[in-house]
Amino acid sequence: MNGTTNFDRTNYFQNVPSTALDLALWMESDRMGHLLGVIDQARLDEQRGVVQNEKRQGENRPYGRVFESVLRASFPEGHPYRWTVIGSMADLNAATLDDVQEWFRTYYGAANAVLVLAGDIDVATAREKAQQYFGHIP
């Protein structure tokens, strides 16, 4: 189980045997549909620290801040691609619990998601399982 984020999307992915498909779908639907209820200030602060450490690690590598300079030189003031996906330390420090919850409600629902299943599964079963696990999520 892993995930990545870029300018236009966040993706979560799992490579599992077909015998673990129900568990994987349950975990992803739980993240999408029920995570918001357990995000509190303590968890936000913990994850903020994790992200800040990731940012510092990137910046402390040789040429670690070059990409920021390239973005500023490539995109006009106000363009969303002008800054890195991770944001600035000031952005990270300023994010509130309300900000995170609103972002989650706006962007991380089933209406904005694409589910891809590949492997030992037929289309009818995939559709049935998608409805079972994600159908109740707005």
Which residues does each predicted region cover?
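Charge-rich, well-structured scaffold segments of protease-associated domains
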Residues: 1-138
